[in-house]
């Protein structure tokens, strides 16, 4: 017959391994449930190293943390002796559990039996308060890397007229080159027109010189023709024949004049014809002089641009 060894009552070791493998059983009906019953229930999850039953709660000390967590998962919320058990890890206090009121020093001991209620609350309060008071491990601060400041040199704006002048000169050169190209083409056209005008003026001058020479060579013949015409109009056919004879004599002494001039001169008096010829000569001369002055001005402008 084998005797079952009871677990010890030691459940208050302070080493981390013992704390992490300890189970707290709350809301326990200790009037009906004994220490042996608690050991029987929790021994199926692993070896129970210690068990202590107190008024309304109990502690179960396992030798392995894995066994303690398995017992918490398996027995939490179980109804035992008409009360629902509140089981969790002793080293991890439940956040929603209210802290027990501390009793007076006279109520700590009740005869021979030691009151673990005050002991448990006071012990874990001190334990977690001590852990909270521990200063955390100082984390080494990252040394900030000093970056060299980039200094931007301040450049003062100096007002200078040189670039503006150069720009103006360049634009002037480009515009002047374009104008020179245009003027060269225009000058070429003007030159061709002037040559044509000059040739026309030369032809007109030669014609005028020819007319003037003819008039100086035969001034009497023209008067006779005029007199014969007048006599023929007043006296009849005899004087008309004389006028025709005079006209024939004049024709033999000089070359025949153009038909337009003879007809116009015959229809007009001698004074009016002469004034008309002089006016035509003066108009042609003034026109030719203006054209020559204009050609000289354009040649001077072309030379200045080149």
Curated annotation (Swiss-Prot):
Residue numbers bearing the Phosphothreonine modification: 262, 286, 298
UniProt note on tissues of expression: Expressed in heart, brain, lung, liver, skeletal muscle, kidney and pancreas. Weakly expressed in placenta.
Taxonomy, superkingdom: Eukaryota
Subcellular localization(s) per the UniProt record: Nucleus
Entries under PROSITE patterns matching the protein: RRM
Subunit structure: Identified in the spliceosome C complex. Interacts (through its RNA-binding domain) with FUS (through its RNA-binding domain); both are components of the same RNPs.
Disulphide linkage map: none
Job of this protein: RNA-binding protein that acts as a transcriptional cofactor for cholesterol biosynthetic genes in the liver. Binds the lipid-responsive non-coding RNA LeXis and is required for LeXis-mediated effect on cholesterogenesis. May be a heterogeneous nuclear ribonucleoprotein (hnRNP).
Region (Disordered): 215-306
InterPro entries, alphabetized: hnRNP_C, Nucleotide-bd_a/b_plait_sf, RALY_RRM, RBD_domain_sf, RRM_dom, RRM_HNRPC/RALY_subfam
Record-annotated RRM domain positions: 21-92
Bias type Basic and acidic residues, positions: 217-226, 287-297
Entry's Gene Ontology BP terms: cholesterol homeostasis; mRNA splicing, via spliceosome; negative regulation of transcription by RNA polymerase II
Protein name per Swiss-Prot or TrEMBL: RNA-binding protein Raly
Organism: Homo sapiens
